[in-house]
Amino acid sequence: MPELIASPTRIPVPGGKVIDEHVGAVNTPEAGLQSSVSVARMTAPAGWSEPFQTPSFDEITVVLSGEVLLDHDGGQLSIVAGQSVITRGGERIRYSCGPEGAEYVAICLPAFSPDTVGREEES
């Protein structure tokens, strides 16, 4: 039977980025999906960036507006509105955004967890 997710849960993070989790450990723990998939809508301000990370999950990022920059061992990708990117678990990556900020959807398989993101300490 279909399950309506009436609203996301806003997850507080530093740096001005907004995370609205629709599916995952925080918003839908009773759905039985909390460990298999997470879906969140992100809004990042101009100039936002986060530390490098080596997640143990795959991530699909769909850019809705603006530009997401993805640093990886081979260089940097620019993903703009209407484009998407897939990163694989075990890859060292860093997300940031362009001068207009960005709005995007992140789908993590298995689900995102602070314990499995492998975020590096900022220097």
Where are the predicted features?
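Short, conserved beta-strand element in jelly-roll/cupin
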Residues: 41-44, 54-70
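Short acidic-glycine-tyrosine-enriched beta hairpin
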Residues: 74-90
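Conserved short histidine dyad/triad with adjacent acidic residue
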Residues: 23-28, 38-55
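Short histidine-centered beta-strand/loop micro-motifs
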Residues: 30-34, 49-55, 72, 96-97
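A short, N-terminal "cap"/entry segment at the start of jelly-roll beta-barrel domains
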Residues: 1-36, 119-123
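Structural motif
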Residues: 67-69, 76, 92, 101
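Ligand-binding loop in jelly-roll beta-barrel domains
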Residues: 89-114
